[in-house]
Each structure stands twice: as structure tokens, then as C-alpha cells.
Amino acid sequence: FDIRGVLDGPSFKPYSGSAYNSLAPKAAPNASQWLTTNNGNKTHTFAQAPYIGDSISKDGIQVGTNTANPQQAVYADKTYQPEPQVGESQWNASVSNNAKAAGRVLKSTTPMYPCYGSYARATNEKGGQSKNNDGVEMRFFASSANDNQNDPTVVMYSEDVNLEAPDTHIVYKPAVTADTISSELLHGQQAAPNRPNYIAFRDNFYWALYYNSTGNMGVLAGQASQLNAVVDLQDRNTELSYQLMLDALGDRSRYFSMWNSAVDSYDPDVRIIENHGVEDELPNYCFPLGAVGVVNSYKGVKQNDGNGWVKDDSVADTNDIAKGNIFAMEINLQANLWRSFLYSNVGLYLPDDLKYTPGNIKLPENKNTYEYMNGRVTVPGLVDTYVNIGARWYPDVMDNINPFNHHRNAGLRYRSMLLGNGRFVPFHIQVPQKFFAIKNLLLLPGSYTYEWNFRKDVNMILQSTLGN
């Protein structure tokens, strides 16, 4: 007979999509505005103005000149210009204090979110993202160093967009008053990627059934001294041993598409964390793109016939020279890669009682939801890296947590792909001949025994990388 159904509900989110702005620092804010109520409502702006134009007028930043006679300035189309990804093409491009610059900024009415993970869908054919093309406002800025000079040198195009974060969640949020969506404090928010959640069935059951021909059809097995088909799920070690035995004995792991029966398998470090000797000798440095330190502007001078110094007219007035060592940063790449692996593959799979909810973050009351499990974090020091010389180790809890629910499980990942990985997945399981039941199988409550019996080592539950 067949079992048909649909996987859906609050805990089902199969994968993490596109990872928008994944190169952005986890705490980098979007260019944004906010209001303060000190001395009346005042708008503050925090933004980058990457586009350098020829001039600024009441019409905005000049982006070119047309070929008419006489020639006329062409100003930015505010529905999509200036484009935020367009700026100076060289690291050494000279931008003077009087250069005319422009950029885009989010209005205070768009909720703040870190740049990491942010996504705003396009709303016009040019790629502009404003909710309302007529709602883009120009905000002009002049240097505050000269009180007598008010000519603008920067114009920011302020807009509201449909800001989403489909693949990330907030892990740090400063304390702000309720319903605050934009403020200076919220620039300090930090985002982290959502964990993938592969959902699949362990098996499609064909291989696990055998026929009981004793004539006791319809009779409870316990009454007829036969095998009882209502069995408990196996403990973790038995389950792992059985999977590895199947992998070693049969072809099931090779030809698994037919029965949706891919054998569970893992990266070795997910089960037993290994260190091989000490590999921590060489430091890693990074340097500025210009390969010099902080530069100052110098003019050329020459000796005046042995009597003091005078300006050298054969040398430019602005020579950029840095003194001393080049600034450099050191990072332990090896340790950070290992630390990141441990946190993502061990720390985030620790039991819930070893995790905590970040401050000021509101998670659902239902602990079985994807949003709750995904939002909980582990103290990094719990699985922090250290130089462990030539030894094998793992936290005790790893021996008590079912390792089959893990995003590095190739078998689960493949079976999840067969289901389609959609947000709502119809499934269809074909089972030979008769009804069956297994204790704790969510889809078939109750206990029944018919002529088809299960082997004692059944392996058929709905599994997910976030938990059964």
C-alpha cells in the first residue's frame, strides 16, 4: 500500500538559499538614516558616497554631459542612480576634499538590518530597489569644517526598500525601546547564517521487510510467539554500526536512487575530532592595498647654494610619502578555520540545554520550530580550538546525540534532494502488501502486526538536520 502526505509546518526550511552579501562583515550596517528627538526631530545619516561626479545642483549629482549644442549636464536618474556598486575603479584614485560625491541611503522608515544577508528585490527595469520611485529624496551635505561655506559636496539619495534577510538571523541586538526600527544603537546588530535543514526519510522500507508465513496473519505476534514488529528505535551506536555494515557489505550505497536509501555518511571530524601534531608555526599577515602606511603630502625642496633650503620647482607640490613600517594585521588562518568548523559542526549540534538565546532576541515559545532551533547559539568557548598535540578527543555529549541529523550527512542530504527540498513537499512511500506500524513513527500512530514483519534493526524515521 502507499503512504502519501505533505511535509510542511513551522519547522520546515530545507536550505539556506543564496547567502546574500556573504562577504560583508557580520556587523557591517547598511547605509542608513535614523531620527533623534534631541532639540526636535533631526535626521542622522551613516553612509558611503562612492560615486564621484562632476558637479552637484538642486537636480542632484551630474553623471555626464549630452552632445547637444550647447552641451547640457545630465543628472542622475534617482530611481536607480547613482548605483551603489559604481565608484572609483582604482585604489589610488585621488578624491579631494572638494570632490562631488553621491550614494544611496535607506530612510529611517526602513528597519535596520546588517548588510550581511540583506536583500531588497528590484522594483523597476533598471534594477532600482525603491518601494516608491517617486519617494526617493535627495539629501545634500556640505563640509562642517568651514562655517562660511555651504555649497554641497555630497548628495545622498534616500529611499525605502523591501529589505529582507531570507538566509540570516540576528544573533546580537543592542537594547533599544520597543518598536524601534532604526537608531544609532542598531548599527551594532550582528547577523549569522541560517543553518540548513535537510528533511528526508531514512528509507523506503523495501529492504527491511520480510514475509512471516506462519499463518498467524492478523494475530498479535506476542500471542503467537513470533517476532513482535513494534520495536523501539535503536541507540546511536547500534544505528551507526548497522549503517557502516550495510555500506561495507552491499551495493546499497552505490545504487541508492532506486529505493531512496542512501547510506548515512559523514566527514570524519564530525564524529571523532582529530588533531595531527602541531601545525601552528607560521604567522599570517595582511597588508593595505597600496602597500604603504599612512601617507602625508610633501612638497619638494632643495638646498639653496649651501645656505638653507628652498622649494624645488622641479618637484610636484603633493608627494604622498609614508614613514616607518607598513601597517599589517596578523590572523591565525589555520586556527580560525578549525574554530569555525568546530562551532558549525559540533557546537551548533549540541543539545539545547547547552545553548542560550542571545540578549534582546525574541524566539518562538515552540522549541520544535525551525526559527527557535536556528536562533539558539552556543558559547564559542565550549568547543573552542586549541593546539592539541597528536590526540583524539570529542565532547562527551557527542556520544549521546544522534549524529545522523547533520548537514554533513551525505546520505541524508541526497535523500532530501530526492524529496525536492521544497518548502512544501508531497511525498509518496510504497510499502508491499500490508499495513505495518512502528513505535514512534509519526505518520502511523498505534500498534498493529500483520503478515509483513520488520527486521529488528529497522531504520525508518523521518529525519532532519535540526533533529528528529
Swiss-Prot record:
Localization annotation: Virion; Host nucleus
GO cellular component: host cell; host cell nucleus; T=25 icosahedral viral capsid
Alphabetical GO biological process terms: microtubule-dependent intracellular transport of viral material towards nucleus; symbiont entry into host cell
InterPro entries: Adenovirus_Pll_hexon_N, Adenovirus_Pll_hexon_sub3, VP_dsDNA_II
Keyword Calcium: no
UniProt main location, coarse: virion
Coiled-coil zones: none
Domain of life of the native organism: Viruses
UniProt KW Amino-acid biosynthesis keyword: no
Induction statement: Expressed in the late phase of the viral replicative cycle.
Keywords: Capsid protein, Cytoplasmic inwards viral transport, Host nucleus, Host-virus interaction, Late protein, Microtubular inwards viral transport, T=25 icosahedral capsid protein, Virion, Virus entry into host cell
Subunit structure of this chain's protein: Homotrimer. Interacts with the capsid vertex protein; this interaction binds the peripentonal hexons to the neighboring penton base. Interacts with the hexon-linking protein; this interaction tethers the hexons surrounding the penton to those situated in the central plate of the facet. Interacts with the hexon-interlacing protein; this interaction lashes the hexons together. Interacts with host dyneins DYNC1LI1 and DYNC1I2; this interaction might be involved in intracellular microtubule-dependent transport of incoming viral capsid.
Other facts noted in the record for this chain: All late proteins expressed from the major late promoter are produced by alternative splicing and alternative polyadenylation of the same gene giving rise to non-overlapping ORFs. A leader sequence is present in the N-terminus of all these mRNAs and is recognized by the viral shutoff protein to provide expression although conventional translation via ribosome scanning from the cap has been shut off in the host cell.
Primary role: Major capsid protein that self-associates to form 240 hexon trimers, each in the shape of a hexagon, building most of the pseudo T=25 capsid. Assembled into trimeric units with the help of the chaperone shutoff protein. Transported by pre-protein VI to the nucleus where it associates with other structural proteins to form an empty capsid. Might be involved, through its interaction with host dyneins, in the intracellular microtubule-dependent transport of incoming viral capsid to the nucleus.
Family: Belongs to the adenoviridae hexon protein family.
Protein name as it appears in the record: Hexon protein
Species name: Human adenovirus A serotype 31
